[in-house]
């Protein structure tokens, strides 16, 4: 087949191909704000505006893109959610660098919604178990003496908070946060903070007196985890962590069932 015939053949086939494609995927019209957002994002990524530099004013952006103020504001709000700009009242938007926290916060709404689905909490608890299992194994193998000292300090604060549930929850979160800090990966930190926030927010309300025993059990389990890390035994640390998180999960599931019965 010569070049001309090959081209003609493709031309004959292309309407059918396009037709099938269009039936599968309807065309979607973009909003003006989305087009402004995409163009500004590309300008930022091309470094036409550097980090810390202010973008043009809303009025200037309206004139540049030939759109109204609502489209400009929607575009800037979308860029803020992506972590590409910071917006303070009375000031022009300023270019910023996306952080790990920004990435995770974008998922927060979807995560909280997923937690309300049947089995949602169990799925997130499993995610936490897999994640922290790797953290304690890493800590047992690589934690410095200074990092182990921070874990020990967090454990001491844990022990001092046993009779105050609000304080204990904060000290519990802090203990696990120190574990998440050990690898030195900011994405790990952001994921860990978000996971705990999402799971704690999904927990039922429980009378203080019923939490005291749970607090003491958690503290004793924290001790076993830290001892295994001090001994540089990743398998033991992993087992201790899994025992701890499975215990926490079972306790809160029991609290949840009891809470439902008393309604």
Curated annotation (Swiss-Prot):
GO molecular-function terms, A-Z: DNA binding; DNA-binding transcription factor activity
Protein keywords: DNA-binding, Repressor, Transcription, Transcription regulation
UniProt record, GO biological process: negative regulation of DNA-templated transcription
Stretches assigned to the HTH gntR-type domain: 30-98
Top-level taxonomic group: Bacteria
Transmembrane segments: none
A Pfam family it matches: GntR
Residues within the DNA-binding region(s): 58-77
Entry-linked InterPro entries: GntR_C (IPR011711), TF_FadR/GntR_C (IPR008920), Tscrpt_reg_HTH_GntR (IPR000524), Tscrpt_reg_NanR (IPR023730), WH-like_DNA-bd_sf (IPR036388), WH_DNA-bd_sf (IPR036390)
Similarity comment: family membership: Belongs to the NanR family.
Primary role: Transcriptional repressor that controls expression of the genes required for the catabolism of sialic acids.
Name of the molecule in the record: HTH-type transcriptional repressor NanR
Protein species of origin: Salmonella arizonae (strain ATCC BAA-731 / CDC346-86 / RSK2980)
